[in-house]
Design a protein with these regions (language model features):
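Positively charged n-region of N-terminal signal peptides that target proteins for export
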Residues: 1-4, 8-9
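Exported/periplasmic ABC-transporter solute-binding proteins
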Residues: 4, 21-266
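C-terminal motif of bacterial Sec signal peptides marking the signal peptidase cleavage site
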Residues: 16-19
Length: 266
């Protein structure tokens, strides 16, 4: 009898181990753009609440997120710029989630309220070096920007035609760092995701148009870029990652996306 009981217990334990092995943990990992932090966290929280899955976001910057997808170290990459032709040639594919404005930000005490694209380009390339040259008070302009792999920097320089020509006092690794730097220097100017801007800085108009959801949506605000989900062609997402992808790109998620300060495309 004792031997029989031991055999039954062994069988029960074996079956339990099989059952545990068959149960896949529901996890989706994302990596990339710091500009997308607000919207991706909002989507992730809603997804976890609805499904009970675990959602992770690693804020490393667009370039690193794109590389993570290519290397297979995350499920979905996050980019605040379009994929380049060479990245698409490597089998990466983009799905546009939303459109975000790139706000041109200055210190709250700065009297300049509006600049043209041409003036912005002249400032960041060092042709214009004093605020008095663009209608402001006398003071040397201090340009703050993002690091080279940043999607925000790529979008800003592409739109202003300043690729490889900007003269930065500091190249910072996150949007939050740019906000802080601009808020602490009365002569600073920088750029940041419109959805990330706080009242510690002033977002100026560009060509007479202020950045807002309405002006980004109708295209009248010129400095804007996409928020992109990056996946790898021919590589199936896990069941949970695909579930999140479908959740984030469905029209039902538009309210969440809009509440995060960006314009949904679906």
């Amino acid at each position: 009898m004792k031997k029989l009981i031991c055999m039954i217990l062994a069988m029960v334990m074996a079956l339990s181990l099989v059952a545990c092995g068959d149960k896949e943990e529901k996890v989706v990992s994302t990596d990339g753009s710091t500009s997308m932090q607000k919207v991706i966290n909002a989507l992730g929280e809603a997804f976890m609440e609805e499904t009970g899955a675990t959602f992770t976001y690693n804020a490393t910057g667009s370039g690193t997120g794109i590389k993570a997808v290519k290397d297979g170290t995350c499920d979905i990459g996050l980019s605040s710029r379009y994929l380049k032709d060479e990245e698409k040639a490597e089998g990466l594919q983009e799905t546009i989630l939303a459109i975000d404005g790139i706000a041109i930000i200055v210190h709250t005490d700065n009297t300049v309220a509006d600049l043209t694209i041409e003036q912005i380009a002249s400032i960041f390339t060092g042709e214009v070096t004093n605020w008095s040259e663009v209608g402001g008070n006398d003071g040397e302009i201090v340009c703050m920007g993002r690091e080279e792999s940043s999607g925000t920097r790529d979008g800003f320089e592409s739109i202003t035609g300043t690729e490889d020509a900007c003269v930065y006092r500091q190249e910072l690794t996150s949007n939050g760092a740019v906000l802080t730097a601009d808020s602490e220097n009365p002569n600073a100017i920088g750029y940041d995701s419109q959805s990330s801007v706080k009242d510690t800085v002033k977002a100026i108009s560009v060509g007479g148009v202020a950045p807002s959801e309405a002006t980004i949506k109708d295209g009248s605000y010129a400095v804007q870029r996409p928020f992109v989900l990056v996946t790898k062609e021919g590589v199936a997402l896990s069941e949970t990652a695909q579930e999140f992808f479908n959740f984030a790109t469905a029209s039902a998620a538009n309210e969440i996306i809009s509440a995060a300060g960006v314009v949904p495309v679906n």
